[in-house]
C-alpha cells in the first residue's frame, strides 16, 4: 500500500540516509567506507565504498559467501591502503567485530524494510590482522609450509577438503597470547581434516585447535598412521606440536587428522 511505501521510505531516510549524510559531513574526503547495505550510504556520503557483501565491489562475493573467517583472512591479504578506513554496517551482518573500532554514530529504527534495527558507524581497527600467522607456542624454527584454514587461497593451494563445511561454522577465533589479543579465521565443528602440506624428515608439525572436550586424535601422513595426538579441552585455541619421523620424505604429503 501507499502507507507501507511511505513508512519504508521514512525508515530508510532515518537510518541509512541519515548515516550517509553524517558521513558526508564528518568523514575525510579520502575515507573508504565499508558497507553491507550500500545504496543510500554510497549515494548520500559521496565517499568511496567497499561493499563487504560484494554487490558493488566485485572482488568480495566469494569471501562473503564463504563466511566471516574467510573474510578476515582475505582482509589480511589485502594491502592496507585498500581496506576500509571506516565501517557503516549492521554489526550482526558484519560478524567480524575484531576489526570494528570506536563507534562514532548509530541510527536505530525498527522497520522490516531495513537490514537490521541498528546500523553503526565506526572507525576501522586492524591491529589483530596477521597477529596469528606464525606458531605462538614454544615451537620455533624455519617455517616450511603453512595451511591457513578459512583462507580460501591457502585452502586451495593445499587441497584442503571442505567436507560438510558451512558458512555459519566459518568464524573468527580470538585468544590472548604473548601479552596481546590475537585473532585467526578458522572452521568450527570439524571432526576430520584432510590436506596436503610440505614436510621434511624430523620436522615438527604444529596444529592450532579448539577442543571442547579432552580427546585423542588419529594422525596419518601419506596413509601411514602415526602416534595418536592427545589434546585437552580449551575454550581458546591451543597448539599441538608433533615431531615427525625421520623417514618422512622431503616433499608434499597428504595429512589426515581425525577425531573419534
What are these regions (language model features)?
Residues 1-11, 48-51, 55:
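Transmembrane alpha-helical segments
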Residues 15-31, 35-36, 40-43, 52, ...:
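C-terminal luminal/periplasmic domains and tails of membrane-associated envelope-modifying transferases
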